[in-house]
Swiss-Prot record:
Gene transcribed to yield this protein: leuB
Reactions mediated catalytically: (2R,3S)-3-isopropylmalate + NAD(+) = 4-methyl-2-oxopentanoate + CO2 + NADH
S-S bridge residues: none
GO BP term, example: L-leucine biosynthetic process
Purpose: Catalyzes the oxidation of 3-carboxy-2-hydroxy-4-methylpentanoate (3-isopropylmalate) to 3-carboxy-4-methyl-2-oxopentanoate. The product decarboxylates to 4-methyl-2 oxopentanoate.
Protein name: 3-isopropylmalate dehydrogenase
SMART domains: Iso_dh
Record keyword Cytoplasm present: yes
Gene Ontology molecular function: any one: magnesium ion binding
Complex and partners: Homodimer.
Cofactor binding, per record: Binds 1 Mg(2+) or Mn(2+) ion per subunit.
Keyword vocabulary terms for this entry: Amino-acid biosynthesis, Branched-chain amino acid biosynthesis, Cytoplasm, Leucine biosynthesis, Magnesium, Manganese, Metal-binding, NAD, Oxidoreductase
Site (Important for catalysis): 142, 193
Amino acid sequence: MATHKLLLLPGDGIGTEVMAEVSRLIDWLNKAGIASFETEHGLVGGAAYDADKVAITDATMALAQASDAVIFGAVGGPKWDGVPYDARPEAGLLRLRKDLGLFANLRPAVCYPALADSSSLKRDVVEGLDIMIVRELTGGVYFGEPKTITDLGNGQKRAVDTQVYDTYEIERIGRVAFDLARKRRNKVTSMEKRNVMKTGVLWNEVITAVHDREYKDVQLDHQLADSGGMNLVKWPKQFDVIVTDNLFGDMLSDIAAMLTGSLGMLPSASLGEVDAKTGKRKSMYEPVHGSAPDIAGKGMANPVAMLASFGMALRYSLDMGALADKLDEAIAAVLAKGLRTADIKSEGTTVISTSQMGEAIVTELQALHA
């Protein structure tokens, strides 16, 4: 049995609480002989700043580079609002993405049947929803130069952000989306704004070319990003895999998140290039929710997104898809029994703590393996 090296970075706020439930799961998998994991722990975000006056140390980055997957909690909180800009908690997350070359962000939006009534949309619109949004993570307007605010000297200022994409950046994110679709329902929807943006024109051309050259078996369609956002709310189950740029992906994934009822349910993955020699890629897995300092330490945090993020690591980095499927089944079964953390409670359900939810999911997984 192969041993997988994991780096656990709990971070700040509820990050430590939800990561404890991943550790619980890993401990059981090791003891049961189902898998073999070696884990390292590190500081990131505000916790790293308190210890070392940086958002992540070089030593922790070295551990990340050497790991098979990084499991990340959450960073930030008002405690660190006054720290230097380059040492702010979020800088640790940005350095991990940059130094590991994580260009593809995978954001699934799944609505469990037991939670269909928690969505702001009607049950028949969201029940059974299963979308994967593939967001380009290292290019586009967030990173393009120049990025300036200029004083024009006449009482006015001018702000400039630059949207830039090269062909190779679009090709590689397109391949990630098409490869995912082949393992799902075989459909990709590409979203951009080709009607008003030159980057949208190039995006459309390159995605189409990659499809026609390498993925003719996958259904491809195109939507403008604004109408795509409308369709996510109007008829979300038309989508399988959505591929889009950094800016639109940021927006569309948050829209999709709210279809499911709670940010506490949503995992994510960030993937790098496949190494030609090893066949592996750098990767990081994290819940979509933040550090939620208002509930930190109260045992109220929902650990499902964190556990589901670990499930994505099993699937996309560790070649343990069958175990990932069982973990998904265990989560669904616990929810079907009416067990809830406070963020997803509803009439007739039982509210339990963070640790109780984690324990219930591991117990359900044990039963599935019995």
